[in-house]
Design a protein with these regions (language model features):
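Terminal, regulation- and interaction-focused segments at domain boundaries
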Residues: 1-29
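Short glycine-enriched loop/turn motifs at secondary-structure junctions
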Residues: 2-3, 27, 49-52, 88
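Amphipathic alpha-helical hairpins
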Residues: 8-10, 21-23, 34, 41, ...
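Residues at alpha-helix termini
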Residues: 28, 45-46, 130
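Compact, glycine-rich, soluble single-domain proteins
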Residues: 32, 38-84
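Beta-strand/loop substructures that line and gate deep hydrophobic ligand-binding cavities in soluble
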Residues: 84-110
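Well-ordered alpha/beta subsegment
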Residues: 105-134
Length: 134
């Protein structure tokens, strides 16, 4: 499913397996995972709230990030690209991937970065396609 800000894919995989699958799919398009926020553990620790298994992965394609930051350093406010993985149940997980193209459009220099926006969109769409094929 194509969302306004990204893509959404449901996987028939456990939460932990889905995280590994998403990480591998991101690598196929040059994205690495820079950060991993365990939302469930953080909410439990900070406010003693129970929450379903949910992680936010900070994904970065160094080449795209370099080009974007060189054009508009303020784009760093939107980096890295967030990818969320959440458990639907024990056998299914929901993945949402930020569309780098949509992020670039928030920049005051969006017109200068349209080619980059298109490339970022294509790469993340390819990641979503890899996941949908599973």
């Amino acid at each position: 499913m194509n969302l306004q800000l990204g893509f959404e894919v449901e996987l028939n995989q456990s939460f932990d397996q889905a995280i590994d699958t998403v990480t591998a799919a991101l690598k196929t398009q040059g994205f690495g995972v820079l950060t991993r926020i365990d939302v469930q553990a953080t909410l439990k620790e900070k406010i003693n709230a129970d929450f379903r298994p949910y992680v936010i992965l900070g994904a970065c394609n160094p080449s795209l990030a370099h080009q974007a930051l060189s054009t508009d350093p303020r784009i760093g406010l939107l980096l890295p690209c967030n990818v969320t993985v959440e458990a639907v149940d024990n056998r299914r997980s929901l993945v949402r991937l930020t569309d780098p193209g949509a992020m670039v459009n928030l920049s005051e220099k969006a017109n200068e970065m349209q080619e980059l926006a298109s490339l970022g969109h294509q790469k993340m769409a390819a990641v979503a396609a890899v996941l949908q094929a599973i």
